[in-house]
């Protein structure tokens, strides 16, 4: 079993064990889809991961007191782009890196609002993006042909990864995974 999938299985088992210790007997993880052989689509050195991590570090250096609200990789449409969004007491910021032109743009998107902090997450507490992308790929039933985008953000009270793959016929499949515990939330194929 490859390390990313093993990591997800270990984290899932740990969550269930902790739930049992704390008396949460109804806790359950989404069933894993068995894929033979398991394919690693990306690793920690893949451009979809390295670029996002580098931009996150740059954002934290520029805004050391900020909390992160989104990290994203987007290759849909053929242009590779990375984005990190965050907020501190002085406002909401977005840092964007365009791979083709090697340009970084930062823009202030608005004023600080207390509600924005509720939509933040600690990037040190989420599952590694490479492991999540590989797990998401396994859920596509072999139909994924390209990694179009991934993002991690707060949605409906949870920090989630949304991973989008291209499929044949210019269609897509979206996979949503809990970014903290690895629970599979949904898999949606374009019709």
Predicted region positions:
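Long, terminal "pre-/pro-" and other extracytoplasmic accessory regions
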Residues: 2-191
């Amino acid at each position: 079993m490859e390390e990313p999938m093993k990591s997800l299985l270990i984290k899932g088992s740990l969550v269930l064990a902790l739930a049992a210790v704390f008396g949460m007997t109804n806790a359950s993880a989404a069933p894993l889809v068995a894929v033979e052989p398991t394919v690693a689509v990306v690793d920690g050195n893949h451009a979809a991961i390295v670029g996002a991590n580098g931009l996150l570090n740059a954002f934290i250096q520029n805004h050391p007191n900020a909390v992160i609200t989104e990290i994203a990789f987007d290759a849909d449409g053929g242009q590779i782009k990375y984005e990190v969004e965050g907020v501190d007491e002085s406002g909401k910021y977005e840092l964007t890196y365009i791979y083709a032109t090697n340009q970084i743009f930062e823009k202030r998107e608005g004023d600080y609002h207390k509600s924005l902090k509720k939509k933040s997450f600690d990037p040190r507490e989420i599952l590694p993006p490479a492991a999540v992308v590989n797990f998401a790929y396994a859920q596509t039933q072999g139909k994924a042909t390209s990694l179009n985008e991934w993002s991690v953000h707060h949605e409906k009270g949870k920090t989630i990864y949304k991973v989008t793959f291209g499929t044949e016929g210019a269609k897509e499949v979206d996979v949503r995974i809990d970014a903290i515990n690895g629970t599979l939330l949904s898999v949606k194929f374009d019709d």
